């Protein structure tokens, strides 16, 4: 039995119905987990002596606009004892109703969830530390969302340099 098969067997026996589906891509297994069961799954993966996923290496989020559910939250786990990586994916329909915080399982999750909220706007229930981490406190919106308005400065070339130069706010004496 492979390690991936062992993970699925343990999850299926201990938490029936928690796993929605699985996918393999480039040698990495992704397990799609129900949002209401993800905390139980994470605790089991960490505490089971055969699995020992003791390291949460990252939490990320994807925006699938215009698809529904729009957001996916990804938990990247590492079992150092078994030298094995695993990704859990949770679908999130409403970013204000995201999954529960994992901070009581892995303390680093507080910061990782803060990053996901700052850039993508997905809230984690029970995380009282959600605040701006990378962006200024007065920033409006979440810039990694697909519907975030793009802003840019026009590139200056030889054919348009006078037009661009005239728009720049140079210091006045």
Question: Where is each model-derived feature located?
Answer:
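Terminal low-complexity/charged segments
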Residues: 1-173
């Amino acid at each position: 039995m492979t390690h991936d098969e062992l993970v699925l067997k343990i999850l299926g026996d201990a938490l029936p119905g928690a796993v929605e589906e699985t996918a393999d891509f480039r040698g990495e297994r992704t397990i799609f987990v129900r949002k209401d069961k993800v905390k139980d799954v994470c605790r089991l993966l960490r505490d089971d002596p055969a699995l020992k996923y003791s390291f949460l290496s990252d939490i990320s989020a994807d925006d699938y606009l215009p698809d529904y559910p729009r957001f996916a939250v990804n938990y990247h786990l590492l079992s150092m004892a078994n030298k094995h990586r695993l990704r859990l994916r949770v679908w999130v329909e409403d970013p204000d109703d995201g999954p529960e915080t994992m901070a009581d399982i892995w303390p680093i999750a507080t910061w990782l969830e803060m990053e996901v909220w700052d850039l993508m706007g997905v809230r984690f229930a029970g995380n009282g530390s959600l605040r701006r981490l990378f962006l200024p406190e007065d920033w409006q919106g979440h810039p990694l969302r697909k519907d975030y308005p793009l802003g840019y400065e026009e590139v200056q070339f030889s054919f348009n340099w006078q037009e661009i130069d005239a728009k720049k706010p140079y210091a006045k004496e």
